[in-house]
Amino acid sequence: MSTKEKLISHVMKEEPVGSRSKVTVVGVGMVGMASAISVLLKDLCDELALVDVMEEKLKGEVMDLQHGSLFLKTHKIVADKDYSVTANSKVVVVTAGARQQEGESRLNLVQRNVNIFKFIIPNIVKYSPNCIIMVVSNPVDILTYVAWKLSGFPRHRVIGSGTNLDSARFRHLMGEKLNIHPSSCHGWIVGEHGDSSVPVWSGVNVAGVSLQGLNPKMGVEGDSENWKAVHKQVVDGAYEVIRLKGYTSWAIGMSVADLVESIIKNLHKVHPVSTLVQGMHGVKDEVFMSIPCVLGNSGLTDVIHMTLKAEEEKQLVTSAETLWGVQKELTL
Protein backbone atom coordinates (compact mmCIF):
# COMPACT_ATOMS: atom_id res chain seq x y z
CA MET A 1 0.00 0.00 0.00
CA SER A 2 1.13 3.52 -0.75
CA THR A 3 1.47 6.17 1.95
CA LYS A 4 -1.68 7.82 0.58
CA GLU A 5 -3.63 4.54 0.78
CA LYS A 6 -2.43 3.97 4.35
CA LEU A 7 -3.44 7.52 5.31
CA ILE A 8 -6.81 7.89 3.60
CA SER A 9 -9.90 5.67 3.38
CA HIS A 10 -12.49 6.67 0.78
CA VAL A 11 -16.05 6.94 2.05
CA MET A 12 -17.50 7.45 -1.44
CA LYS A 13 -16.41 7.70 -5.05
CA GLU A 14 -16.34 11.42 -5.76
CA GLU A 15 -18.15 12.48 -8.91
CA PRO A 16 -16.39 15.18 -10.93
CA VAL A 17 -18.04 18.53 -10.25
CA GLY A 18 -17.64 21.30 -12.79
CA SER A 19 -16.25 24.64 -11.71
CA ARG A 20 -18.90 27.15 -10.64
CA SER A 21 -16.72 30.25 -10.74
CA LYS A 22 -13.75 29.51 -12.98
CA VAL A 23 -11.79 32.55 -14.12
CA THR A 24 -9.28 32.50 -16.98
CA VAL A 25 -6.64 35.14 -17.58
CA VAL A 26 -5.24 35.26 -21.11
CA GLY A 27 -1.76 36.78 -21.06
CA VAL A 28 0.72 36.48 -18.19
CA GLY A 29 2.39 39.85 -18.60
CA MET A 30 2.40 42.48 -15.88
CA VAL A 31 -1.32 43.29 -16.22
CA GLY A 32 -2.35 39.64 -16.52
CA MET A 33 -0.50 38.57 -13.38
CA ALA A 34 -1.66 41.61 -11.40
CA SER A 35 -5.22 40.69 -12.42
CA ALA A 36 -4.64 37.05 -11.47
CA ILE A 37 -3.27 37.79 -8.00
CA SER A 38 -6.01 40.38 -7.37
CA VAL A 39 -8.71 37.82 -8.26
CA LEU A 40 -7.03 35.18 -6.06
CA LEU A 41 -6.64 37.46 -3.05
CA LYS A 42 -10.34 38.38 -3.21
CA ASP A 43 -11.28 34.64 -3.25
CA LEU A 44 -13.40 35.10 -6.38
CA CYS A 45 -12.91 31.75 -8.14
CA ASP A 46 -12.76 28.05 -7.40
CA GLU A 47 -10.38 27.57 -10.34
CA LEU A 48 -7.94 29.95 -12.05
CA ALA A 49 -6.53 29.19 -15.50
CA LEU A 50 -3.66 31.06 -17.16
CA VAL A 51 -2.91 31.00 -20.89
CA ASP A 52 -0.01 32.45 -22.85
CA VAL A 53 2.14 31.62 -25.86
CA MET A 54 5.35 32.08 -23.82
CA GLU A 55 5.62 28.61 -22.28
CA GLU A 56 8.60 29.18 -19.99
CA LYS A 57 7.18 32.34 -18.43
CA LEU A 58 3.75 30.73 -18.15
CA LYS A 59 5.20 27.72 -16.34
CA GLY A 60 7.18 29.94 -13.98
CA GLU A 61 4.22 32.16 -13.15
CA VAL A 62 1.84 29.28 -12.41
CA MET A 63 4.46 27.51 -10.26
CA ASP A 64 5.02 30.72 -8.32
CA LEU A 65 1.27 31.03 -7.64
CA GLN A 66 0.88 27.33 -6.80
CA HIS A 67 3.69 27.59 -4.26
CA GLY A 68 1.51 30.12 -2.42
CA SER A 69 -1.56 27.85 -2.43
CA LEU A 70 -1.43 27.52 1.36
CA PHE A 71 -2.22 31.22 1.63
CA LEU A 72 -5.09 31.15 -0.87
CA LYS A 73 -8.61 29.71 -0.91
CA THR A 74 -8.60 28.79 -4.61
CA HIS A 75 -8.35 25.03 -4.88
CA LYS A 76 -7.04 24.76 -8.43
CA ILE A 77 -4.55 26.92 -10.35
CA VAL A 78 -3.68 25.64 -13.83
CA ALA A 79 -1.88 26.90 -16.92
CA ASP A 80 -1.18 25.86 -20.50
CA LYS A 81 -0.59 27.39 -23.90
CA ASP A 82 -3.43 25.16 -25.15
CA TYR A 83 -6.82 26.81 -24.68
CA SER A 84 -8.43 23.54 -23.55
CA VAL A 85 -7.20 24.50 -20.07
CA THR A 86 -9.73 27.37 -20.12
CA ALA A 87 -12.75 25.10 -20.69
CA ASN A 88 -16.00 26.06 -18.96
CA SER A 89 -14.81 29.40 -17.63
CA LYS A 90 -17.37 31.80 -16.17
CA VAL A 91 -15.24 34.88 -16.92
CA VAL A 92 -12.33 35.13 -19.36
CA VAL A 93 -10.10 38.17 -18.84
CA VAL A 94 -8.09 39.09 -21.94
CA THR A 95 -4.91 41.02 -21.16
CA ALA A 96 -2.72 39.67 -23.96
CA GLY A 97 -1.37 42.00 -26.58
CA ALA A 98 1.48 44.23 -27.57
CA ARG A 99 2.57 46.40 -24.66
CA GLN A 100 2.04 50.16 -24.76
CA GLN A 101 5.37 51.95 -25.11
CA GLU A 102 6.35 55.19 -23.38
CA GLY A 103 4.58 58.08 -25.10
CA GLU A 104 2.52 55.78 -27.33
CA SER A 105 -1.22 56.43 -27.41
CA ARG A 106 -3.52 53.49 -26.82
CA LEU A 107 -4.98 53.93 -30.29
CA ASN A 108 -1.58 53.34 -31.92
CA LEU A 109 -1.58 49.82 -30.53
CA VAL A 110 -4.73 48.82 -32.32
CA GLN A 111 -3.91 46.86 -35.48
CA ARG A 112 -1.11 44.89 -33.79
CA ASN A 113 -3.55 43.74 -31.14
CA VAL A 114 -6.42 43.06 -33.56
CA ASN A 115 -4.28 40.42 -35.24
CA ILE A 116 -3.55 38.78 -31.88
CA PHE A 117 -7.28 38.75 -31.07
CA LYS A 118 -8.04 36.85 -34.28
CA PHE A 119 -6.30 33.88 -32.64
CA ILE A 120 -7.40 34.38 -29.02
CA ILE A 121 -11.15 35.04 -29.29
CA PRO A 122 -12.16 31.99 -31.40
CA ASN A 123 -10.28 29.75 -28.94
CA ILE A 124 -12.09 31.29 -25.96
CA VAL A 125 -15.45 30.74 -27.67
CA LYS A 126 -14.56 27.14 -28.58
CA TYR A 127 -13.93 26.08 -24.99
CA SER A 128 -16.21 28.45 -23.03
CA PRO A 129 -19.20 29.21 -25.26
CA ASN A 130 -21.23 30.56 -22.33
CA CYS A 131 -18.55 32.72 -20.72
CA ILE A 132 -18.37 36.46 -20.21
CA ILE A 133 -15.39 37.99 -22.02
CA MET A 134 -13.71 40.91 -20.28
CA VAL A 135 -11.27 42.78 -22.50
CA VAL A 136 -8.43 44.67 -20.81
CA SER A 137 -5.88 44.89 -23.65
CA ASN A 138 -5.45 48.37 -25.12
CA PRO A 139 -6.93 50.22 -26.90
CA VAL A 140 -9.66 48.59 -24.83
CA ASP A 141 -12.75 50.15 -26.42
CA ILE A 142 -11.82 49.18 -29.97
CA LEU A 143 -10.61 45.72 -28.91
CA THR A 144 -13.88 45.11 -27.04
CA TYR A 145 -15.69 45.85 -30.31
CA VAL A 146 -13.28 43.46 -32.08
CA ALA A 147 -13.88 40.73 -29.46
CA TRP A 148 -17.65 41.21 -29.81
CA LYS A 149 -17.47 40.85 -33.60
CA LEU A 150 -15.11 37.86 -33.55
CA SER A 151 -16.95 36.02 -30.76
CA GLY A 152 -20.50 36.28 -32.08
CA PHE A 153 -21.57 36.71 -28.44
CA PRO A 154 -24.49 38.96 -27.46
CA ARG A 155 -23.33 42.41 -26.37
CA HIS A 156 -24.07 41.77 -22.68
CA ARG A 157 -21.37 39.05 -22.55
CA VAL A 158 -18.51 41.12 -24.01
CA ILE A 159 -17.34 43.87 -21.68
CA GLY A 160 -14.33 46.18 -21.74
CA SER A 161 -12.61 47.21 -18.50
CA GLY A 162 -13.05 50.72 -19.89
CA THR A 163 -12.93 53.71 -17.56
CA ASN A 164 -13.41 51.76 -14.32
CA LEU A 165 -9.77 52.55 -13.55
CA ASP A 166 -9.94 56.12 -14.91
CA SER A 167 -12.88 56.77 -12.57
CA ALA A 168 -10.92 55.25 -9.67
CA ARG A 169 -7.96 57.54 -10.47
CA PHE A 170 -10.38 60.48 -10.66
CA ARG A 171 -11.87 59.69 -7.25
CA HIS A 172 -8.41 59.17 -5.74
CA LEU A 173 -7.26 62.58 -6.99
CA MET A 174 -10.48 64.23 -5.79
CA GLY A 175 -9.86 62.66 -2.40
CA GLU A 176 -6.29 63.97 -2.35
CA LYS A 177 -7.54 67.48 -3.09
CA LEU A 178 -10.32 67.34 -0.47
CA ASN A 179 -8.57 65.12 2.11
CA ILE A 180 -11.47 62.64 1.93
CA HIS A 181 -11.34 58.88 1.23
CA PRO A 182 -11.91 58.07 -2.48
CA SER A 183 -14.94 55.90 -1.64
CA SER A 184 -16.70 59.05 -0.36
CA CYS A 185 -15.82 61.05 -3.48
CA HIS A 186 -18.25 60.32 -6.30
CA GLY A 187 -17.40 61.09 -9.90
CA TRP A 188 -17.45 59.39 -13.27
CA ILE A 189 -15.12 59.32 -16.24
CA VAL A 190 -16.93 58.11 -19.36
CA GLY A 191 -16.17 57.71 -23.07
CA GLU A 192 -12.84 56.40 -24.31
CA HIS A 193 -10.39 54.80 -21.91
CA GLY A 194 -7.70 57.19 -22.99
CA ASP A 195 -6.96 60.65 -24.22
CA SER A 196 -10.52 61.69 -25.16
CA SER A 197 -12.19 60.50 -21.94
CA VAL A 198 -14.94 62.71 -20.53
CA PRO A 199 -15.18 63.79 -16.87
CA VAL A 200 -18.81 64.24 -15.82
CA TRP A 201 -18.24 67.32 -13.67
CA SER A 202 -21.98 67.92 -13.33
CA GLY A 203 -22.29 64.69 -11.35
CA VAL A 204 -19.28 65.07 -9.04
CA ASN A 205 -20.40 65.03 -5.41
CA VAL A 206 -19.46 64.28 -1.83
CA ALA A 207 -22.28 63.03 0.43
CA GLY A 208 -24.79 64.10 -2.21
CA VAL A 209 -23.45 67.67 -2.29
CA SER A 210 -22.77 68.73 -5.88
CA LEU A 211 -19.30 70.25 -6.10
CA GLN A 212 -20.27 72.11 -9.26
CA GLY A 213 -23.13 73.60 -7.25
CA LEU A 214 -20.51 75.00 -4.86
CA ASN A 215 -18.09 75.97 -7.64
CA PRO A 216 -19.94 76.59 -10.95
CA LYS A 217 -16.63 76.95 -12.82
CA MET A 218 -15.44 73.48 -11.79
CA GLY A 219 -13.84 71.69 -14.73
CA VAL A 220 -13.81 74.70 -17.06
CA GLU A 221 -11.33 77.47 -17.89
CA GLY A 222 -11.20 80.28 -15.36
CA ASP A 223 -11.58 78.05 -12.31
CA SER A 224 -9.24 79.51 -9.66
CA GLU A 225 -8.95 76.03 -8.07
CA ASN A 226 -8.00 74.47 -11.42
CA TRP A 227 -10.09 71.29 -11.04
CA LYS A 228 -9.60 70.71 -14.77
CA ALA A 229 -6.03 69.67 -13.92
CA VAL A 230 -7.47 66.69 -12.01
CA HIS A 231 -8.83 65.20 -15.23
CA LYS A 232 -5.52 65.93 -16.99
CA GLN A 233 -3.78 63.95 -14.24
CA VAL A 234 -6.21 61.07 -14.84
CA VAL A 235 -5.36 61.04 -18.57
CA ASP A 236 -1.63 61.47 -17.97
CA GLY A 237 -1.52 59.05 -15.04
CA ALA A 238 -0.89 55.87 -17.02
CA TYR A 239 1.72 57.56 -19.21
CA GLU A 240 3.51 58.82 -16.10
CA VAL A 241 3.53 55.37 -14.47
CA ILE A 242 4.86 53.85 -17.71
CA ARG A 243 7.59 56.52 -17.83
CA LEU A 244 8.60 55.81 -14.24
CA LYS A 245 8.39 52.00 -14.01
CA GLY A 246 7.96 50.84 -17.61
CA TYR A 247 4.39 49.52 -17.40
CA THR A 248 1.15 49.75 -15.39
CA SER A 249 -0.04 46.76 -13.41
CA TRP A 250 -1.34 47.01 -9.85
CA ALA A 251 -4.19 49.48 -10.25
CA ILE A 252 -5.54 47.87 -13.43
CA GLY A 253 -5.24 44.43 -11.79
CA MET A 254 -7.32 45.62 -8.83
CA SER A 255 -9.82 47.23 -11.21
CA VAL A 256 -10.22 43.93 -13.09
CA ALA A 257 -10.84 42.05 -9.83
CA ASP A 258 -13.43 44.68 -8.87
CA LEU A 259 -15.34 43.97 -12.10
CA VAL A 260 -14.94 40.18 -11.83
CA GLU A 261 -16.32 40.34 -8.27
CA SER A 262 -19.49 42.12 -9.42
CA ILE A 263 -20.06 39.40 -12.03
CA ILE A 264 -19.17 36.32 -9.96
CA LYS A 265 -21.08 37.50 -6.87
CA ASN A 266 -24.02 38.87 -8.90
CA LEU A 267 -23.69 42.20 -7.07
CA HIS A 268 -25.58 44.38 -9.58
CA LYS A 269 -23.06 47.14 -8.93
CA VAL A 270 -22.75 50.05 -11.35
CA HIS A 271 -19.38 50.40 -13.09
CA PRO A 272 -18.16 52.56 -15.97
CA VAL A 273 -17.30 49.82 -18.48
CA SER A 274 -17.05 49.65 -22.23
CA THR A 275 -20.21 48.56 -24.04
CA LEU A 276 -22.01 49.24 -27.32
CA VAL A 277 -23.27 52.84 -27.10
CA GLN A 278 -24.71 53.26 -30.59
CA GLY A 279 -27.96 55.23 -30.33
CA MET A 280 -27.16 56.66 -26.88
CA HIS A 281 -26.14 60.24 -26.07
CA GLY A 282 -26.04 61.20 -29.73
CA VAL A 283 -23.56 58.47 -30.75
CA LYS A 284 -24.42 57.26 -34.27
CA ASP A 285 -21.61 54.79 -34.99
CA GLU A 286 -21.16 51.17 -33.86
CA VAL A 287 -18.60 51.91 -31.17
CA PHE A 288 -17.90 50.64 -27.67
CA MET A 289 -17.25 53.22 -24.95
CA SER A 290 -17.67 53.45 -21.21
CA ILE A 291 -20.93 54.50 -19.63
CA PRO A 292 -22.28 53.46 -16.22
CA CYS A 293 -23.51 49.85 -16.47
CA VAL A 294 -24.91 47.26 -14.07
CA LEU A 295 -22.84 44.07 -13.79
CA GLY A 296 -24.17 40.76 -12.51
CA ASN A 297 -23.97 37.01 -13.05
CA SER A 298 -25.34 37.26 -16.60
CA GLY A 299 -22.85 39.95 -17.56
CA LEU A 300 -23.84 43.52 -18.35
CA THR A 301 -27.54 43.60 -17.50
CA ASP A 302 -28.45 47.30 -17.71
CA VAL A 303 -27.10 50.71 -18.68
CA ILE A 304 -27.72 53.85 -16.66
CA HIS A 305 -29.15 56.89 -18.47
CA MET A 306 -26.78 59.66 -17.43
CA THR A 307 -28.02 63.23 -17.21
CA LEU A 308 -25.29 65.09 -19.07
CA LYS A 309 -24.85 68.77 -19.78
CA ALA A 310 -24.72 69.75 -23.46
CA GLU A 311 -20.94 70.24 -23.35
CA GLU A 312 -20.39 66.83 -21.73
CA GLU A 313 -22.57 65.12 -24.33
CA LYS A 314 -20.68 66.93 -27.09
CA GLN A 315 -17.37 65.66 -25.66
CA LEU A 316 -18.78 62.12 -25.52
CA VAL A 317 -19.78 62.27 -29.21
CA THR A 318 -16.29 63.59 -30.05
CA SER A 319 -14.77 60.69 -28.09
CA ALA A 320 -16.93 58.26 -30.11
CA GLU A 321 -15.85 59.90 -33.38
CA THR A 322 -12.19 59.55 -32.36
CA LEU A 323 -12.68 55.81 -31.83
CA TRP A 324 -14.72 55.36 -35.01
CA GLY A 325 -12.01 57.11 -37.03
CA VAL A 326 -9.59 54.32 -36.13
CA GLN A 327 -12.12 51.49 -35.96
CA LYS A 328 -13.51 51.92 -39.48
CA GLU A 329 -10.02 51.27 -40.90
CA LEU A 330 -9.66 47.88 -39.20
CA THR A 331 -9.49 44.61 -41.09
CA LEU A 332 -11.23 41.89 -39.08
From Swiss-Prot:
Gene designation per UniProt: ldha
EC code: 1.1.1.27
Gene Ontology CC terms, in alphabetical order: cytoplasm
UniProt name for this protein: L-lactate dehydrogenase A chain
Catalytic activity, reaction form: (S)-lactate + NAD(+) = pyruvate + NADH + H(+)
Pathway: Fermentation; pyruvate fermentation to lactate; (S)-lactate from pyruvate: step 1/1
List of residues binding substrate: R106, N138, R169, T248
Family label: Belongs to the LDH/MDH superfamily. LDH family.
Entries under Pfam families matching the protein: Ldh_1_C, Ldh_1_N
Known role: Interconverts simultaneously and stereospecifically pyruvate and lactate with concomitant interconversion of NADH and NAD(+).
GO molecular function ontology, one term from the record: L-lactate dehydrogenase activity
Chief localisation class: cytoplasm
Keyword Oxidoreductase attached: yes
Ligand binding (NAD(+)): 29-57, 99, 138
